[in-house]
Amino acid sequence: MNMTKTAMLIALMTVMFMSIGYLLGGGGGMMIALVIAVTMNLFGYWNSDKMVLRMYNAQEVDERSAPDYYRMVSGLAANAGLPMPKVYIIHEDQPNAFATGRNPENAAVAATTGLLNRLTPEEVAGVMAHELAHVQNRDTLTMTIVATLAGAISMLGNFAFFLGGNRENGNGIMGVVGTILAMIVAPFAAMIVQMAVSRTREYAADKRGAEICGNPLWLSSALGKIARGAKAIPNEEAEHNPATAHMFIINPLSGRGADNLFSTHPDTDNRIAALEQMAAEMGIRSAGMAPRAAAPSQSSGPWGNAGGNSNGGSGYRGPWS
C-alpha cells in the first residue's frame, strides 16, 4: 500500500511539473517539461549518492579504520539479507545518519561522529538498522526522485512568474491569474507531496529497522537522543542545503529560520510511541543497554572502540557481536 501511495504521489508531482510547462509554452512546453523531468531523474539516479556524500565531506571507512562500526553494519546487513553497503563517517557534532544509493547493490550508509560518540552501541545499531531498512525498501531512490521533482517544480514556478505564462493560453486576466497561482501554489504543493512521501517511508523504515536489529527500544531510545541533539547542535551543512533534510533519520535543521515550517519527518514522539507499542507486542520490556563507554581518544576516533570489546566482552550483545 505504501509503495502504491508513493507511486501515486510521484505521478501527481510529474503532472504538476508538466502543467507548469503547459502554462509556459502550451503543448510544446509540457513536453519540454517532461523531458527535463526525465533527464533530471536519470542524472539523479546515477549520481545522487556521490553528490550528497561529497556535499557532507563523508569519509569512507572499512574494517581496519572503523572496526566496530563497520562490523555492526555488516552484521545488520546480513540480518536484513542485504549486500554489504559502503560505510561512511561524517565529521559533524550533531548526531544523525542517512542512507543513499540507487539500489541495494549500490548503497551507502553514513553516520555522524556526533551520533557515534553520544549513543550507546545498541542505539547506534537501531539507527543503522533503520537506514538499512530504507535501502531494502528502495526509499533512497524514491526520495531522490521526489526531491528532484520538487526542486524542478519550484524552479518552473518561478519561471512562470518571470515569463508571464504562455501567450496562446493566457487570454488576458485569466492567464495572469493562472500564472500567479502556478508560481505560488505549485512549490507548496510539491513540498506537501514530498513531506507525505517522506513521512510514510519513515514509519515503514522504523518498523523494519526494529525487526532487523531485534529490539524496537534501541531505535526508540536513539530517536529521542538524536531529536534533542538536532535541536541543540546546528548542522551547518544541512542548514545550507535544506533540500537534503528528508534523507536524515531526524530532521537536521535547527529551526533557526523558517526551515521547520513544513517538517519532512513524522513527529518524533509518535515514532517513539509506535516503536514502544511494537516492543510491547513482542514482549520486550527493556532495551537491555549497557552504560555508554567514555568517548575514546581522538586518535582512535569515536567509532574505533565505542562500547568496549567488539567480541562482546563488555557485557552487551547485539547483531555486531
Curated annotation (Swiss-Prot):
Which keywords does the record carry?
Cell inner membrane, Cell membrane, Hydrolase, Membrane, Metal-binding, Metalloprotease, Protease, Transmembrane, Transmembrane helix, Zinc
Molecular function terms in GO for this entry?
A: metalloendopeptidase activity; zinc ion binding
**EC number(s) reported in the record:** 3.4.24.-
**Active site residues per record:** 131
Question: How does the cofactor attach, per the note?
Answer: Binds 1 zinc ion per subunit.
Q: How does the record say this protein sits in the membrane?
A: Multi-pass membrane protein
Q: Which Gene3D superfamilies match?
A: Metalloproteases ('zincins'), catalytic domain (3.30.2010.10)
Domain of life per record: Bacteria
Q: Which GO terms describe its biological process?
A: proteolysis
Q: Which Pfam families match?
A: Peptidase_M48 (PF01435)
Enzyme type, top EC level: hydrolase
Disordered: annotated span = 287-321
**What protein is this chain from?**
Protease HtpX homolog
Q: Name one GO cellular component term.
A: plasma membrane
Please state where this protein is localized: Cell inner membrane
| Cofactor(s) in the UniProt record | Zn(2+)
Q: Which residues bind Zn(2+)?
A: 130, 134, 202
Family annotation (InterPro entries): HtpX_protease, Pept_M48_protease_HtpX, Peptidase_M48
The entry assigns this protein to a family as follows:
Belongs to the peptidase M48B family.
Query: Could you tell me which species this protein originates from?
Result: Brucella anthropi (strain ATCC 49188 / DSM 6882 / CCUG 24695 / JCM 21032 / LMG 3331 / NBRC 15819 / NCTC 12168 / Alc 37)
Q: Could you tell me where the Gly residues compositional bias lies? A: 304-321
HAMAP family according to UniProt: Pept_M48_protease_HtpX (MF_00188)
Residue ranges of the TM segments: 7-24, 29-46, 145-165, 173-193
